[in-house]
Amino acid sequence: MMPIPANPTNASIQPRSLYDAWADLAWRAMLTEVNLSPKPGLVDRLNCGAHKDMALADFHRSAEAIRHWLPRFMEYGASCTRLPPESVLAGLRPLGMACEAAMFRATAGVNTHKGSIFSLGLLCAAIGRLYQLRQPIAAETLCATAADFCRGLTTRELRQNNLLLTAGQRLYQQQGLTGARGEAEAGYPLVIRHALPHYRALLAQGRDPDLALLDTLLLLMSLNGDTNVASRGGADGLRWLQQHAAFLLHQGGIRTPDDLVYLHRFDQQCIERNLSPGGSADLLIVTWFLAQISQVNH
C-alpha cells in the first residue's frame, strides 16, 4: 500500500491546492483497492478475477482519468451552498456523466470505476460544501452530507414501475436490493458503522495495512447486498458469497500472510461461479479514503 506523504501545514494554503490534495487521496484509494491482492473474484495484481473484459492496467488508466475530475465535484459542492442539499445531486449528474465519459475513453469502453465515480463524486462534493461552510471535514460529516444530497433517490429511481426496467430497478423489485443508491442515501452505514471502525481497530492493533484491508473487504462482502454479485449469481450466489466471507471471518479472518491461502481459494471459487463483489470493492475504496481524510490539513 502506498504511504501518504506528509502534507503542508501552511495556514494560507489555497482551496485549489486543498482540492488537489483530496483528489489525490481519492486517486490513491482507487489504486490501493485494485492493487490489493488477492481479492475474491476481483481484478488485482494476480489475475482478473471473474472478469474477462478488464485488467489491472484498465483500472490504473481509469483512476488517472477520474483523478482530474474530482476537484470539479468539490468546486461544485462549494459553489452551491445556498441550495438545499437535496437539490445538489441534479447539478452533480452532468459532472458524473462527463467523468464517466473520460473513464470510458481511458479504458476503450470498459466500465472499471462507475460505482466509484458515484461515491467519490458525492463525497468530493460534500468536501467542497463543508469546506465552504467552514464545517468539520470528517468521515461522519462527509457521509451525512452525501446522504442529504441523495435524499429520496431510492424512491425516485428504483421504485418506479417502468416497462423497461434498469438492472438496478430489477434487482430492487426482485430482491429488495438498493445497491449504491441505497447505501449513499443512508449515509454509508456499512462503512461508518462496520468497515471503517473495523479497519481502524486492526491498524491500532498493529495489523499489516494490506492484511487489515483484506480482512475489511471480507467484512463488507459478508454484510453487503452487492448488486454486482446478485446480477451475476442471483440471490443464491449473493447468499453463498456472504456466508463464505462470514465463515472466513469467524475462522479468524486474515491475520497473517499464511491466511492468504484462504483468499486464493475463495478467489478461485468466485471465478468458477462468475461472481465479482464490485459493490464491496467500491465501499472498500470509500473506507480507505475516509480513513485517510485527516491526512489533509485544512
From Swiss-Prot:
<comment type="similarity">
    <text>Belongs to the CitG/MdcB family.</text>
</comment>
<keyword id="KW-0067">ATP-binding</keyword>
<keyword id="KW-0547">Nucleotide-binding</keyword>
<dbReference type="InterPro" id="IPR017551">
    <property type="entry name" value="TriPribosyl-deP-CoA_syn_CitG"/>
</dbReference>
<dbReference type="Pfam" id="PF01874">
    <property type="entry name" value="CitG"/>
</dbReference>
<dbReference type="GO" id="GO:0051191">
    <property type="term" value="P:prosthetic group biosynthetic process"/>
</dbReference>
<dbReference type="GO" id="GO:0005524">
    <property type="term" value="F:ATP binding"/>
</dbReference>
<keyword id="KW-0808">Transferase</keyword>
<protein>
    <recommendedName>
        <fullName>Probable 2-(5''-triphosphoribosyl)-3'-dephosphocoenzyme-A synthase 2</fullName>
        <ecNumber>2.4.2.52</ecNumber>
    </recommendedName>
</protein>
<dbReference type="GO" id="GO:0046917">
    <property type="term" value="F:triphosphoribosyl-dephospho-CoA synthase activity"/>
</dbReference>
<dbReference type="InterPro" id="IPR002736">
    <property type="entry name" value="CitG"/>
</dbReference>
